[in-house]
A protein has these predicted regions:
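Interhelical loop/hinge segments that connect adjacent transmembrane helices in multipass membrane
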Residues: 3-11, 122-125, 181-194, 204-249, ...
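Membrane-interface junctions at transmembrane-helix termini in multi-pass inner-membrane proteins
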Residues: 11-12, 74, 139-162
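Interfacial transmembrane-helix starts/ends
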Residues: 12, 50, 83-98, 232, ...
């Protein structure tokens, strides 16, 4: 019981701090999405930032190939049976990510013409900048993998700070540079935007290297030999589930941009609604990052009672918080329409 209470206290503490950074980041993101982008960019220019990100999210999920949940679930086994100098799980994860990103890079010239046929007529600005999906995807893959290993060593607060808060601050600075005339060419703006995720990638990579918690190991261990089949099945199941989840969240924007008469302008309007929905997802994101290592350890120890308590307590907390956020959003819909203007009504 004492161990469980300590685990819940750790999860609660990390969730609170993570939620603070995530909500602060969302406040800045809301200022960017609900005010700055609609006011200082055309709907097509705003829509381009959203559609590039949505395409990159789908491709990055493909490139991670289900390795992230595998790393989280099976790292306790590697930690228990191997010293960190012989733990090759991080090497396996990053190597597979590198291979998938390399395949995407070399196959993109063959994929691009197919995509251009879909978007060129209704979203010509996307056709001119579709190649920027590559740096966005690669940086998202790198950040996702680094984030998982930051969670494993307990640096969930730092990972959430970099991904949710720091990134949006940098986006705000780039937008302000556009507003102040320091950037006067939209091509330069969108080029900068596509590379912004590399900033938290570099910072988080440096922190993990300084921690000396992981090493590059190219020798197959007995743990990998024992669990490789189970890891492949587990990763494959999660991969298919996550792909469907990401597509469900992003395909509507892509379809609107390719089929709607307004193209990216209509996609920008739809983005406002989807952004408000993601606000309700914040508590879940912060709690997952804090609870997942604890859940993985409980699975490894076969502590079903702890798993039962963790799932029930986190689910109850998330239900209460999300219900409150939904109520606030519904009550403020008229205010959102008033601020955004008639184009977004």
């Amino acid at each position: 019981v004492a161990v469980f209470l300590f685990s819940m206290a750790t999860i609660r503490k990390q969730s609170i701090y993570s939620s603070i950074y995530i909500y602060a980041g969302f406040a800045i993101g809301a200022f960017n999405v609900l005010f700055l982008f609609p006011k200082f960019f055309t709907p097509e220019e705003f829509g381009l930032t959203r559609i590039l990100m949505d395409i990159a999210l789908i491709l990055s999920m493909i490139c991670t190939a289900g390795t992230l949940p595998v790393a989280l679930k099976f790292f306790p086994f590697y930690k228990h049976y191997l010293p960190k100098e012989k733990n090759e799980l991080p090497t396996l994860v990053f190597t597979l990510g590198l291979i998938m990103c390399t395949l995407l890079y070399f196959s993109f010239p063959y994929i691009e013409p197919i995509a251009l046929k879909k978007f060129s007529s209704r979203s010509p600005i996307l056709a001119n900048h579709l190649r920027l999906v590559l740096p966005l995807t690669i940086s998202l893959v790198a950040l996702s993998m680094l984030e998982v290993f930051a969670w494993i060593i307990g640096k969930t607060i730092l990972a959430n700070f970099l991904k949710e808060f720091m990134f949006r601050i940098v986006v705000l600075l780039v937008i302000l540079a556009w507003v102040l005339g320091m950037i006067n060419d939209y091509t330069i703006f969108i080029e900068l935007y596509a590379y912004l995720y590399f900033i938290p990638v570099v910072v988080l990579a440096w922190v993990l290297m300084r921690s000396q918690s992981f090493h590059l190991v190219f020798k197959k261990s007995k743990v990998t030999h024992k669990f490789s089949g189970m890891m492949a099945r587990f990763g494959g199941a999660y991969f298919l589930g996550n792909i469907l989840n990401v597509i469900a969240k992003t395909n509507d924007t892509i379809i609107i941009a390719s089929q709607s008469a307004g193209g990216l302008a209509d996609a920008a309007i739809f983005t406002i609604a989807t952004y408000l929905i993601t606000v309700m997802d914040v508590p879940q994101r912060s709690m997952v990052s804090a609870a997942t290592p604890q859940i993985a350890q409980a699975w490894k120890d076969k502590d079903l009672a702890k798993l039962d308590r963790l799932y029930k307590k986190t689910a109850l907390n998330l239900l209460v918080i999300a219900s409150g956020i939904l109520g606030v959003v519904i009550l403020n819909i008229p205010a959102f329409v008033h601020v955004l203007g008639p184009n977004y009504e």
